[in-house]
């Protein structure tokens, strides 16, 4: 059964595709390097769009990239308006997506807890076999 997509999801997907191309091809800011757009959440009235992105690097590189994207938001919005047929083009708000880092931290904590449990109860592994 096909999934029903709301208009905001379709617009968000289109904005993500267009922004990815614009950032890669048109944006000349040296602070914005290898950026991956993780997702776009568009408000119901299509007035605002949160653009989630990831970038490899240090905290300083992340801050620089965020600033570069925020400063380019007007240019990117104007270019989106030229490429998409929308009555109003959403204002762009860029947010760093740290879910991968949080997931890696949680995974490491789980691995550590399992290793500690096995170290405290080594005979339990033999009983399960």
From Swiss-Prot:
According to its UniProt record, which protein family does this protein belong to? Belongs to the RbfA family.
Q: Which UniProt keywords apply?
A: Cytoplasm, Ribosome biogenesis
Q: What is the lineage of its organism?
A: Bacteria, Pseudomonadati, Pseudomonadota, Gammaproteobacteria, Chromatiales
Q: Which GO terms describe its molecular function?
A: ribosomal small subunit binding
What's an example Gene Ontology biological process for this entry? Answer: maturation of SSU-rRNA
Q: Where in the cell is it found?
A: Cytoplasm
Q: How does it assemble?
A: Monomer. Binds 30S ribosomal subunits, but not 50S ribosomal subunits or 70S ribosomes.
What is this protein's name? Ribosome-binding factor A
Note the PROSITE patterns from the entry. RBFA
This chain's function reads: One of several proteins that assist in the late maturation steps of the functional core of the 30S ribosomal subunit. Associates with free 30S ribosomal subunits (but not with 30S subunits that are part of 70S ribosomes or polysomes). Required for efficient processing of 16S rRNA. May interact with the 5'-terminal helix region of 16S rRNA.
Q: Which InterPro entries does the record cross-reference, listed alphabetically? A: KH_dom-like_a/b, RbfA, RbfA_dom_sf, Ribosome-bd_factorA_CS
- Note the HAMAP family from the entry: RbfA
Q: Name one GO cellular component term.
A: cytosol
Tell me which domain of life the UniProt entry assigns to the organism this sequence originates from.
Bacteria
């Amino acid at each position: 059964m096909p999934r029903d997509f709301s208009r905001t999801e379709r617009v968000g997907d289109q904005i993500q595709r267009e922004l990815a191309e614009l950032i890669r091809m048109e944006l000349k800011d040296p602070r914005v390097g290898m950026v991956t757009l993780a997702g776009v959440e568009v408000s119901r009235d299509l007035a605002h769009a949160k653009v989630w992105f990831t970038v490899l690097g240090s905290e300083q590189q992340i801050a620089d990239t965020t600033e570069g994207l925020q400063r380019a938001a007007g240019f990117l919005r104007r270019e989106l308006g030229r490429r998409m047929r929308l009555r109003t083009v959403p204002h762009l708000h860029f947010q760093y997506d740290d879910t991968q880092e949080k997931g890696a931290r949680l995974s490491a904590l789980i691995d550590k807890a399992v290793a500690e449990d096995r170290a405290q109860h080594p005979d339990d592994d033999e009983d399960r076999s």
